[in-house]
């Protein structure tokens, strides 16, 4: 409840030049298809800026909330799940979201979540992993972190297929990743041939699936 992150991560407007091209004005977009990722939005930039790539609104490659959630993940993996929940709640508190200490409470606070086919053993550690799966998505949306989370958890291919299954069936052909991902191969890129030839220590051995 009262989670402010959606309104930050989704931008429902555009800034456009006014008639004399001296300043920008805010124009609301009514259509959902005209909404954009809202992180580092121009709303935070000084009015009248000329170059949107030269302002005081900087891209953050690593945020404190990310560090806190990584610490929560680490505590959970070493068996200290209560401390993991405490740290996760630090992030939720800052966002105005309801603080929780169990997966049941987390689902009650976020009622539109769907069930995951992974992290489903039912023990407390897996329950926290499920909450963390969602929480990192809410907190770090559009920041380039999600793929690496899914890789770290070993569920990238499963997540791609799950997301595909939730889409409109008429759009399935437009989401090829769910069909074409090969587990054990597509987690990594191939090592370029030039690098293999330049480094004898690699023994001409490419990453799995690219031999």
Can you annotate each of these PLM segments?
Residues 4-211:
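Acidic/polar-rich alpha-helix caps and helix-coil junctions
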């Amino acid at each position: 409840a009262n989670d402010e992150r959606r309104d930050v991560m989704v931008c429902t407007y555009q800034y456009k030049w006014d008639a004399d091209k001296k300043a920008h004005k805010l124009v609301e977009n009514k259509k959902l298809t005209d909404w954009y990722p809202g992180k580092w939005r121009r709303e935070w930039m000084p009015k009248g800026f000329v170059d949107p790539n030269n302002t005081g609104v900087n891209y953050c490659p690593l945020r404190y909330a990310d560090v806190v959630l990584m610490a929560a993940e680490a505590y959970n993996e070493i068996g200290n799940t209560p401390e993991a929940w405490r740290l996760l709640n630090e992030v939720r508190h800052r966002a105005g979201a309801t603080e929780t200490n169990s997966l049941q409470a987390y689902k009650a606070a976020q009622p539109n979540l769907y069930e995951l086919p992974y992290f489903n053993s039912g023990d407390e550690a897996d329950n926290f992993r499920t909450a963390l799966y969602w929480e990192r998505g809410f907190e770090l949306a559009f920041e380039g972190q999600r793929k690496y989370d899914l890789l770290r958890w070993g569920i990238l291919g499963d997540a791609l297929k799950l997301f595909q299954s939730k889409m409109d069936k008429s759009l399935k052909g437009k989401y090829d990743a769910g069909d074409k991902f090969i587990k054990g191969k597509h987690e990594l890129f191939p090592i370029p041939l030039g690098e293999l030839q330049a480094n004898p220590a690699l023994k001409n051995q490419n990453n799995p699936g690219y031999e």
